[in-house]
Amino acid sequence: MTAQLIDGKAIAASLRQQIAQRVAERRQQGLRAPGLAVILVGTDPASQVYVSHKRKDCEEVGFLSRAYDLPAETSQADLLALIDELNEDPTIDGILVQLPLPEHLDSSLLLERIRPDKDVDGFHPYNIGRLAQRMPLLRPCTPKGIMTLLESTGADLYGMHAVVVGASNIVGRPMAMELLLAGCTVTVTHRFTKDLAGHVGQADIVVVAAGKPGLVKGEWIKEGAIVIDVGINRQEDGKLVGDVVYETALPRAGWITPVPGGVGPMTRAGLLENTLHAAEHLHK
């Protein structure tokens, strides 16, 4: 058996098309286009690439895109003032602060300053709390995108055993809550977990978001399991690889995401979906 590929690139392209159509309908109705403000502090090359992709996506779907490229030495006070200004701007539905930030800045304080109804990354404690209470409003983009990927397989998720490898605030923890909401039995593993292979081997769904290339071996995967690889690691030869050993997982899994072209495009699509949702339901 060879796993079927879950093509995140194609699914994200379809979502962008649907969003663009909805934006065009809004314009025809005399409504404004959704607006997204992206704040980039410093010159981290990976962050610059991510931000350029997000701006391109906004252009493609017809959003208003506002870019703030700030020097690395920008102060906390100046950033807070900018966020306050954007919070009150009626043309902006979403505010995104690109992480990681320079060391002198407190990312928690900055993210909490974003109004929850403009927190399109879904990281504000209010939005995480809503998800935990089974009343999601703006959902963290990567877990949201992964749920769309899982739905695309046609699998009935109710009662499935899902194992999340990695317990970060950005992916692992909200991912566990999304899977609970979908009716899965959820195990979260982390750096202190004993017998990772044993946990993975029991999983009907494995979501790996540890940031460690090749952490999960293909032979650990249960026959027919759905494998979602969130990791994106650049090797010395420039090749991008995930956290799962793809070549050995492929013959065992039922479905698997490639790296690149799996989860990454869905994270960006989730950001657009959240911004549109904010414009349509939170900022009428």
From Swiss-Prot:
> Which sites bind NADP(+)?
G166, A167, S168, I232
> Which keywords belong to this entry?
Amino-acid biosynthesis, Histidine biosynthesis, Hydrolase, Methionine biosynthesis, Multifunctional enzyme, NADP, One-carbon metabolism, Oxidoreductase, Purine biosynthesis
Q: Which GO cellular component does the record give, naming just one?
A: cytosol
What Pfam families does its record include?
THF_DHG_CYH, THF_DHG_CYH_C
Which InterPro entries does the UniProt entry name for this protein?
A: Aminoacid_DH-like_N_sf, NAD(P)-bd_dom_sf, THF_DH/CycHdrlase, THF_DH/CycHdrlase_cat_dom, THF_DH/CycHdrlase_CS, THF_DH/CycHdrlase_NAD-bd_dom
Q: In which pathway does it act?
A: One-carbon metabolism; tetrahydrofolate interconversion
Q: Which reaction does it catalyse?
A: (6R)-5,10-methylene-5,6,7,8-tetrahydrofolate + NADP(+) = (6R)-5,10-methenyltetrahydrofolate + NADPH; (6R)-5,10-methenyltetrahydrofolate + H2O = (6R)-10-formyltetrahydrofolate + H(+)
Report TM segments.
none
Q: Does the keyword Disulfide bond apply?
A: no
One MF term in the entry's GO annotations: methenyltetrahydrofolate cyclohydrolase activity
BP term (GO), one: tetrahydrofolate interconversion
The UniProt record lists the EC number as 1.5.1.5, 3.5.4.9
Does this UniProt record's set of keywords contain Acetylation? no
Q: Which HAMAP family match?
A: THF_DHG_CYH
Describe the function of this protein. Catalyzes the oxidation of 5,10-methylenetetrahydrofolate to 5,10-methenyltetrahydrofolate and then the hydrolysis of 5,10-methenyltetrahydrofolate to 10-formyltetrahydrofolate.
Question: What quaternary arrangement does the UniProt entry report?
Answer: Homodimer.
Family of this protein: Belongs to the tetrahydrofolate dehydrogenase/cyclohydrolase family.
PANTHER family linked:
C-1-TETRAHYDROFOLATE SYNTHASE, CYTOPLASMIC (PTHR48099:SF5), C-1-TETRAHYDROFOLATE SYNTHASE, CYTOPLASMIC-RELATED (PTHR48099)
| Protein name, UniProt field | Bifunctional protein FolD 1
Organism in which the protein naturally occurs: Ectopseudomonas mendocina (strain ymp) (Pseudomonas mendocina)
Taxonomic lineage per UniProt?
Answer: Bacteria, Pseudomonadati, Pseudomonadota, Gammaproteobacteria, Pseudomonadales
What gene name is given for the protein in this entry? folD1
